[in-house]
């Protein structure tokens, strides 16, 4: 796995990559966070924290936004019953987004990488409720955003580590251990990290 990839035009920016917050991250909202970057260009960047949970459960969220009624809660497919809702970031926190495998496409679906897509409409929630939808998916409320040049500056100031994003790490259910496992996967001993973290 490639680490510490610096954003640049030649490398196509950081679309489809992970950001891992350095231990000295001063913004508590991003402490020990793993962020999946969906869009990164000279106009800025956006992504989702994938290892923080929202207090709301997926079935309750479906009911709150009118996808299902109270009576439907007992007949939800097993997958929908156990799907969790992530805290994607501090921006637009009432808006829902679904990162998913590329076997599901609607008009509003945006490809992020060769095998990951993003859909932010209610159609995909209805598909998951109906027992269909993509094979792999994660739901997030809110997103993380950076102004032009901001993310590049934070990476340069050692606020973030960057690395490739294997699908198993993106979609697996071990949310609490994801940060430590990615550090270990990159061969990083956190006790020996020297940092002067930037701001997120």
UniProtKB/Swiss-Prot annotation:
Q: Where is the signal peptide?
A: none
User: A Pfam family matched by this chain, by name?
Assistant: DUF179
Q: What Gene Ontology cellular component terms go with this record?
A: cytosol
Among HAMAP family, the record links this protein to: UPF0301
- Family the UniProt entry places it in: Belongs to the UPF0301 (AlgH) family.
What NCBIfam families does the entry give? PRK00228.1-4 (NF001268)
* Protein name as annotated: UPF0301 protein BAB1_0506
């Amino acid at each position: 796995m490639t680490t510490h990839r610096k954003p640049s035009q030649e490398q196509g920016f950081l679309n489809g990559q992970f950001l891992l917050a350095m231990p000295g991250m001063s913004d508590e909202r991003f402490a020990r966070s793993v962020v999946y970057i969906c869009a990164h260009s000279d106009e800025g960047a956006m992504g989702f924290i994938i290892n923080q949970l929202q207090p709301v459960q997926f079935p309750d969220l479906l009911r709150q936004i009118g996808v299902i009624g109270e009576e439907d809660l007992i007949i939800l497919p097993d997958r929908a019953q156990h799907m969790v809702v992530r805290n994607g970031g501090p921006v637009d926190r009432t808006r829902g987004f679904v990162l998913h495998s590329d076997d599901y496409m609607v008009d509003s679906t945006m490809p992020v990488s060769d095998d990951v897509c993003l859909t932010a409409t209610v159609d995909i929630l209805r598909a998951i409720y109906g027992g269909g939808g993509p094979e792999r998916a994660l739901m997030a409320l809110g997103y993380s955003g950076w102004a032009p040049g901001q993310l590049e500056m934070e990476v340069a100031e050692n606020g973030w580590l960057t690395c490739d994003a294997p699908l198993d790490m993106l979609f697996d259910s071990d949310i609490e251990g994801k940060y430590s496992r990615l550090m270990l996967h990159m061969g990083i001993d956190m006790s020996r990290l020297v940092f002067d973290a930037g701001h997120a």
